[in-house]
Curated annotation (Swiss-Prot):
It holds the Pfam family DegT_DnrJ_EryC1. It catalyses: 2-deoxy-L-scyllo-inosose + L-glutamine = 2-deoxy-scyllo-inosamine + 2-oxoglutaramate; 3-amino-2,3-dideoxy-scyllo-inosose + L-glutamine = 2-deoxystreptamine + 2-oxoglutaramate. Belongs to the DegT/DnrJ/EryC1 family. L-glutamine:2-deoxy-scyllo-inosose/scyllo-inosose aminotransferase subfamily. The modification N6-(pyridoxal phosphate)lysine is found at K202. One of its GO terms (molecular function) is pyridoxal phosphate binding. The keyword Calcium does not apply. Gene3D superfamilies: Aspartate Aminotransferase, domain 1, Type I PLP-dependent aspartate aminotransferase-like (Major domain). It comes from Streptoalloteichus tenebrarius (strain ATCC 17920 / DSM 40477 / JCM 4838 / CBS 697.72 / NBRC 16177 / NCIMB 11028 / NRRL B-12390 / A12253. 1 / ISP 5477). CDD domains: AHBA_syn. Signal peptide: none annotated. One of its GO terms (biological process) is polysaccharide biosynthetic process. Its EC number is 2.6.1.100, 2.6.1.101. This is L-glutamine:2-deoxy-scyllo-inosose aminotransferase.
Length: 424
């Protein structure tokens, strides 16, 4: 019997290399050298009479997103914790979050001693289902965290309305959506606070890093204190050689600051973000058409989305394809055909082994609290069903050309056609 699939030692669809990520911006190397020679490598270093890279990035990123304030931070996780604490979330409060997301969307809530309430998702967008959010609200609910997942913008019209109706802050987790827009506004600017990750894989990256944006001067000031050991920037510049942070005693914080090297890289990477996003979008739109012709359902976005950002490309397999096969068998076969990783979706948070609050003694705050933060108590049927049917891949593959999209489609067609080999 002839062998066709590469995973069974057949000939792969493609052996050529794929685009790599990160791709350094044209000015990144010079920017790093300027910081290296500046005598100031952190915001806690001595003021040298010129604007720090961190303040420059904060100014540029706020302007890019059309908001008044940006507070850079060490990571997306740190940014989300700043947002939660600045909005007053604390011990025992409930925070509604999606059941399908990266683990930090829930672990940060536990990290401020609050209780994540995981709710199901919209099957088309894979983002928070507004009806499920409304049904989950209780007198203990303190905030709603909405994640713009993979390449979709969540239904911000409905979610903002739900939050406003119940007097709750809406926190947008935009770790995967830099530059995406809802009704002409950048994501992150619709909620009370928007948070971002600049980790290695993100479309805007400095290796590690994060930021929180807001139009509220009060929330911004709280986040400044929370990320810099209770210190904030002064109203006037200090004398050269003095530290450009002042101790106010307003709010105890911790060190979650971005370094000057990371900030300098982000200033340059931001200049190229829109161009890269446009290329990803063009290629993804072509791939959407090619895969839909084969019966796959590419991830949709909500009404009101005016611009998508593709961090991860996701598509649902046809209902009658690969019945009885684990999704990992399918993704491994596609990976062998293409030479880059095709992966399942995230595991739903109520079954995700990375989200295990009971493994940390610091969260053992009494039997009742431990029951409330146990993720196994949630029932998320849409998350469970879809994660058995979704294939995903990283945005780097979308930085190529149309021939690359045809290769991906050809690999999917080949594995669909010869799926019997996966059962042998």
């Amino acid at each position: 019997m002839p062998v066709h699939l590469a995973i069974n030692n057949g000939t792969p669809v493609r052996t050529r290399p794929w685009p790599v990520w990160p791709q350094p911006a044209r000015g990144a190397l010079d920017a790093l050298e300027r910081v290296l020679r500046s005598g100031r490598w952190a915001i806690s270093g001595p003021y040298r009479g010129i604007e720090s890279a961190e303040r420059r990035f904060a100014r540029d990123f706020a302007a890019y997103n059309g908001v008044a304030h940006c507070v850079p931070a060490a990571s997306g996780t740190a940014s989300l914790m700043l947002a939660l604490e600045s909005c007053g979330v604390g011990v025992g409060d409930e925070v509604i979050a999606p059941g399908l997301s990266w683990v930090a969307s829930a672990s940060t809530i536990v990290g401020v001693n609050a209780v994540p309430v995981l709710v199901d998702i919209d099957p088309r967008t894979l983002c928070l289902d507004p009806a499920a959010v409304e049904a989950a609200i209780t007198p203990a609910t303190k905030a709603v965290v909405v994640v713009h997942l993979y390449s979709a913008v969540a239904d911000l019209d409905a979610l903002r309305a739900v939050a406003d109706r119940h007097g709750l802050p809406l926190i947008e987790d935009c770790a995967q959506a830099h530059g995406a827009e809802h009704r002409g506004r950048k994501v992150g600017s619709v909620g009370d606070v928007g948070t971002f990750s600049m980790q290695h894989s993100k479309v805007l990256t400095s290796g590690e890093g994060g930021a929180a944006i807001t139009n509220s001067a009060e929330l911004a000031r709280r986040m400044e204190h929370l990320r810099a050991d209770g210190r904030c920037y002064p109203d006037t510049a200090p004398a050269p050689g003095r530290m450009e942070l002042v101790e106010t005693g307003e709010l105890m914080g911790s060190n979650r600051c971005l370094s000057e090297f990371q900030a300098a890289v982000l200033v340059e990477q931001l200049r190229e973000l829109d161009e890269q996003n446009a290329l990803r979008r063009r290629n993804a739109e072509l791939l959407n058409t090619l895969l839909a012709e084969q019966g796959l359902r590419p991830q949709a976005t909500s009404p009101g989305t005016t611009s998508r950002t593709y961090y991860v490309y996701a598509a649902e397999l046809p209902d009658d394809a690969f019945v009885g096969l684990p999704i990992t068998t399918v993704t491994e076969a596609l990976t062998a055909e293409l030479g880059f990783p095709i992966s399942p979706a995230y595991a739903p948070l109520h079954t995700n082994r990375l989200y295990a609050p009971a493994s940390r003694r610091r969260f053992a705050l009494g039997e009742e609290h431990e029951k409330r933060i146990d993720p196994a108590r949630f029932h998320l049927p849409v998350c469970e069903r879809l994660t058995r049917r979704l294939i995903t891949f990283h945005h780097a593959a979308l930085l190529g050309d149309e021939s690359d999209m045809h290769d991906i489609a050809a690999a999917v067609a080949k594995v669909l056609r010869h799926h019997g080999e996966l059962r042998a």
